[in-house]
Structures are given as C-alpha cells and as structure tokens.
Amino acid sequence: MKYLLRNIIIILIVVAGVNIFTEKMSEKKKGEANPGTSEDAPTSSFITDATSFEAADEEDEELDADAYSSRDWTSLMAMPTDEQIYSVKGLGRSPYIALYMHFPGVRRAMEYCADFHADHQPKGTYLCPFNWWMDVSSLKEQYTSVYNDYTGTPGGYCGFQRLGDGSRVFIMTVWTTFCEDSDGNVTVFTPKVVYPENKGEANRTNAEGSFVQCILPYDWRAGRDYRVLIQQTNAADTGNVVLTSWVYDMTNHRWDELVSFDTGIRDIYMYSCGGFLENFLTEYTGEVRTMELSNMQARSADTGEWVAADYIQFTVNGSLTKLGYIGSCNFDTDGASLWAITSGVSGLCETPSDEEPYYLEEGVTGDPY
C-alpha cells in the first residue's frame, strides 16, 4: 500500500509538471507567432533566431499544381524557349518593374503590410515588397539640410533574393542620414542592426551611397504565399525609431522576426511606400520572373487605422543606376492585387503604359497579425 501511494504521488507530480510546461510553451508560441501592434511588439529575446534559418541551394522541388497561382502567365506573356533564353545570356538585365502604392489619407505610416507570391523565381531574382522614405520633418526643424547621399531622401527597403548559387535570402537596407547646420557642421546618423546581433554591414557596395545592410538566409519558395510586415517602434532606452521586418509563412503558419534596425533618430516616420521586381544577374536575364502582391495596407501614424492601397503607379526601367535593360514585361492590377512578369527576351508581349495609375478594388483592412 505504501509503495502504491508513493507511485500515485509521483504520477500526480509528473502530470502537474507536464501541464505547467505545456502552458508555458503555449504562452511562448503565442508570443512567437504574433508580432503584435507597433505599440506592444514583443522583444526579440523570445523570437525565432534569424541566424538559424537555412538557405536552400538545391533545385526547386516539384510542387502540386494547386500550390501555384491560378493566374495563367502564358496568356500574359509568351514563354521564351531555351534557345531564346540562352541567346540573351549576359547581354543585359530584364526589365526593372518598380511600383508605388497609394494609401488614401495616410501621410505618415507606422506599419506596412503586404502578401506576396512568386511562381517564377530563377537565380538573379529580387522581389522587393517594400521600399520607403522617411519623414524627417523633426530633423529639418533643427538643421538647414537633411539628406541621404544616394537618393537625397533617407529611407530603406527590404525584400527577397535568389542568388547565383541557388540560395535564397532576405535583405534589408536602411540609409544613413546626414544633417548639416547653418555653420556647415554635419551630424551623421548611421543605422545599426540590433537584431540579430553583429549582422549589419555598412556600405557593402559603392552603388547606393551610405547605408547599413543585413542579409540573412530565408528559404522563400516558388508557389508559396508569404506576408511581410515592416513595423516601426521606439527603443525603450533612447526613444530612437526602430524598424523591424517580420515575415509570415502561410504554409507553415509561422511569424518570424528577421531584422531590426535602430535608426539612431527620434520622431521620424515612414511614408511613400513602393516595391520592385528586379533581375540582378545578367547570366539569367532571359528567365521568366513573376511577382504578385495583395493585402497591401498601411497603418497611419496619425490615426492608428489600417488603410488599403487604392491604386498602383508602375514604372519601367526607372532604376537610379540606369543599367542596361532588355526584354519583355507585362503588369496590371487585378481586383485588390497586382502582378508583374518579365524576361530578358524581347517580343514576348506588348509593354503596358506606365503613365497612368492602375486602380485596385477596395481591399480588406484590419489587423494583419
């Protein structure tokens, strides 16, 4: 009887311990799975470590037909043959499609959100959902000149690349801000990557002025859906604006915090958001690239409300670097989404006009978390 009682007590203790552990893990998963609003965003101390993500260098796995977009790409652009693709290898870059998202009534934003999908993402593909400027009005009250030495206006961008070795990465860049006073003295605000630690690299290339950039493995896959969120918060100790990128994998139902930048500046806000689809390796210029964006929303810094984009302004080959572009492209809006397709092979379709806005149907707005 004594031994039976002891065993019962042991079992009860074990069960209680398991229940407590399960509750703790449940709480942790809830925190990890949700970025929260910009007011109560969790700290990165319990978010999946971005450095643990694995890049894939193997060839794309064959996905089920229903994994891909229902869009008939062959009706939007003729598919190039292998011979055509080979014939333009190294001759230039396929068309650079940039886009501006208009959010009615949003003067300044604390968050941007969009869902993206790529059926075709060959090597040398850069799909950028967000490219934004910063409203630095507060600095202009203190200095006679506030600028960035590349675009003129401070800002940043983030997106997803397929590298030449086949690996897939996430990239986020924030430009350095220069402030000059009436005596000609220049104060420099250099952004810093605060998560993950020691991952930022300053001025990695000479092509885009002064900036800090973070590149991390992220295995974004063709035919899958993702949601990307750029969130602005204030550092608890300094009040500096912190810009954080999150990605939601809709296949695995998981939010991941990827990168956080401390801008070193207070009281600035994001505005004028856009994106682009780019081919950055001429060896793969003839390959087909596609991009689809939907659920494009901005959270107003003035009202706190989420607002859906109402039109898109496309631009063809408008890159500041003015590289040599060749080939075909097509783009349009469809309901509350947009799409674009490119190839370095010419004559596959007619290029649409980029002079007029492309309107979107009214999208669903609200908490994207």
Locate predicted features:
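Flexible glycan-contacting loops in extracellular carbohydrate-active proteins
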Residues: 263-287
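Local beta-strand/beta-hairpin segments that build beta-sheet-rich folds
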Residues: 85, 252-263, 309
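Secretory/extracellular carbohydrate-interaction modules
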Residues: 84-193
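Activation corresponds to long, low-complexity, non-globular regions
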Residues: 73-106, 119-123, 285-369
